[in-house]
Amino acid sequence: MVVSPWDAMNFILYSDVNDRSISQSLGRPEYSYYFVLKAYRPVLESLGQVHVVASAAEVDPLYRQLQLAGQDSLFLSFAPPHKTPTDLQCPVVCVIAWEYDSIPVAPREEDAHHDWSRILARHGRAITLSSHTAQAIRRTMGEDFPVLVLPTPLWEGFAAVRQQYPAAPVNPGAVLQINGCIIDSRALGLSADGLIAPTPNEQAVEACEPVDIAAPSEPVPPPPELTLRRRAFITKHYLREGWRATAASNEHPRLFLLKHNLLLWYREAVRDLLPVALRRQLFRLRTPAPEPLPPTVSVEAPTVAEHPQACLPDTSATLQTEVSGVVYVSVFNPEDGRKNWHHLITAFCWAMRDVEDATLVLKMTQNDLATYYVHLITLLSQLSPFACRVVVMHGYLEDEEFARLYGAASFYVNASRCEGLCLPLMEFMSCGRPVIAPDHTAMHDYIDERVGFIVKSSREPTIWPDDVRILYRTLRHRPDWGSLKKAYEDSYAMAKSDPVAYQAMALAANERMREYCSFAPVQQRLAQFFQLTPSASPELIAEAGTASC
């Protein structure tokens, strides 16, 4: 038990995701609110008694029980206003993460449950995670509407990570572990030729086609010739892939991988140098002659074979991988259209195309691998060959495993179109990691040139996420791909050639988070907003972690 210097107040907390469901809730819209509640809880425990309820239906019975005991209560709903009850007896305050420049309003009565202005007016006040959200609320509710801007107080929580994993521009080697699966670009044998798996019917038709092809009616311009430099680069790439196939253990036989890489090298680098007659002979050696078809007597329509489905990796194993060099990390839900993850990957692969010691680690907060696996493999295949490395981690990370990820990072990367706060960005900055990120929406509160490399962006119209009318009534931001690519290049150059500047930026990132989201200033602002004053006879409250749930 600890002594609280403030008047007694009971805080009733609720989030749709809790400790029991968090590992199964990756990718849900309410996923981030769980971490906001978890970060707020120690501050609230320092101001009064905390009660975490499993459902909103438990709020009023608990409120009446505490009221009979002569104690004040306040319900903090870690959810958007339209998912917060409006018929409770207990006073309610919404804790809101919102990334657009205006809040949903409903001119039609049938959409009233999505009208935030009515709900917030009923509550009378609100807590937001950023100045951007507070401005959006005041544009609708008026400048005098009580809104507290309160970022999550998480800086102190990363003291152990800062001590155990000091910032380093070039990682000498770190082991990452996850219970799920790891997709490594260097173990995939990537090639654009392997994007489409032929069906049995397509294979039969291809085998029966004659070798001689009739000349088209109009001349087709020949493809541009490959330069010697390009041929050498392709040769180097497949030599490296062949060496990896023999040196590392793999689910495929080594001979199969060697033949696969040899075939791809032949197609991309030397096939056009061989005479046509020789190419035909090689094709016949590789493709057996088709057997004669039996006479058909049936006139039934042939069945169309379906394309084979993608074989997904096993997601139940505990796997490890080692990363080294300049390591970029990003954490996001690939199903969230705001995250702009395609640009995050393409800009990296183009910026580091010839760089072998640059690695991009993507931690996916999504339970269903099938929702993005094909898109990811297609994108990486289209970008190949590239010398850099992309590692995708799918699954749930425990705290110790996440600490390894924090420690492995040289930079954290964000390329979002809009953010309500971006907890992962703040967490990596609290670990003393410089960043690559835009400075729009919530990130404008804590991102500038002293803590990272700014990605330029411009505004574009968009819709509110739950708008049933699908009208363009708000704005988000469009990150500039060229600016993101240049940020990768500039950050890599700093890490390799200017470690002093890197350490200065890392120190600035850590200091920014200490000023922005450390415990004491957040506690003071929260006490002032709720008009709590130091108590003459302070009461006992539960220690962090022992509050009733």
Identify the residue ranges that each predicted region occupies.
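A charged, aromatic-enriched C-terminal amphipathic alpha-helix characteristic of glycosyltransferases
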Residues: L475-K486, A493-Q528
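Short alpha-helical donor nucleotide-sugar binding micro-motif in glycosyltransferases
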Residues: A403-A409
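N-terminal pre-catalytic "stem/leader" segment of glycosyltransferase-like enzymes
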Residues: M1-A79, P85-L88, P334, T359, ...
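Aromatic "clamp/platform" in nucleotide-sugar-dependent glycosyltransferases that forms part
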Residues: R417
